[in-house]
Regions:
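Phosphate- and divalent-cation-binding pockets in alpha/beta enzyme and binding domains
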Residues: 35-38, 146, 181, 207-208, ...
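Active-site phosphate-binding/coordination module
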Residues: 4, 9-107
Length: 258
């Protein structure tokens, strides 16, 4: 998708070329399930849809296949850590999105992106069970990076913490990450990880790269994301996804036996 979160015709056509070549196509995102629903029909998706970076997997009818929640006893401490870096905090639970500051940074943009509005609450004290994702939000990108590093330091392997955008820090269950999604799909479809191609542009895509034979970074990705990938395509404003499918994925698929 473009910087303005628009699904282009070239990207849609590229996915349909994958279908025609009998290449399975799946999507994973930090978005909630409802925030990915608008992609199902245009992309003719029939594979599991991995929302919240793998925190919830749903089918095309939005029925839950699998769900992984943040340990309830860590929800409060993670929120406190985010606040210590002056991040606004969003909480996702099931299909719902909660905020305490409806006029906070990026709330309106996120509502436009996911096509639904958040529920406004005074605090999150009563919402510690079944939390799929916590998001720290700030336009201070250094604060996002430092909060991510501190989350790794404080919580270790008990959560996954990674930036899904320069201004978003996503915290999820330790197995709710895009690496888990790649492993899950490999098992589901009896594939070797070497047969999987992944395309991404954010730090939360790096774990996914590690579990695929062909990893492709978008041209708009940060340098560390590009270094983690085997190939680099054009930017999302210059049809980088469609070019990656044409230049890398389809030729690799044609070389597969059978």
């Amino acid at each position: 998708m473009t910087q303005d979160k628009v699904l282009t015709k070239a990207a849609t056509d590229a996915v349909h070329q994958l279908h025609e070549a009998d290449v399975l196509f799946a999507i994973t995102s930090g978005r909630p399930p409802r925030g990915m629903q608008m992609l199902i029909d245009p992309l003719d998706l029939h594979t599991p849809i991995a929302a919240f970076n793998g925190g919830i997997l749903v089918d095309r009818d939005m029925h839950t296949i699998e769900q992984k929640a943040i340990p309830p006893d860590l929800v409060g401490p993670v929120i406190d850590l985010m606040k210590s870096f002056d991040l606004d905090v969003w909480l996702y639970r099931g299909a719902d999105w909660f905020v305490t500051e409806p006029k906070g940074p990026h709330v309106d943009r996120e509502a436009w992106t996911v096509k639904f509005d958040p529920s406004v609450v005074d605090d999150y004290d009563h919402l510690s069970d079944q939390v799929a994702k916590l998001v720290g939000v700030s336009d201070d990108h250094d604060a996002i990076q430092k909060a991510s590093e501190e989350a790794h330091e404080q919580f270790g392997d008990h959560v996954t913490a990674a930036a899904s955008q320069p201004y978003y820090l996503d915290v999820t269950h330790p197995d709710a990450n895009k690496g888990f999604v790649a492993r899950y799909l490999a098992k589901q479809y009896e594939l070797d990880e070497a047969e999987i191609a992944t395309i991404g542009d954010m730090p939360n895509d790096v774990l996914m790269f590690a579990h695929s034979g062909l990893s492709i970074a978008m041209g708009n990705a940060d340098p560390q994301v590009k270094r983690a990938a085997r190939r680099v395509t054009d930017t999302n404003e210059k049809e980088g996804f469609a070019k990656a499918v044409e230049r890398f994925v389809l030729p690799a698929a044609r070389q597969q036996p059978g």
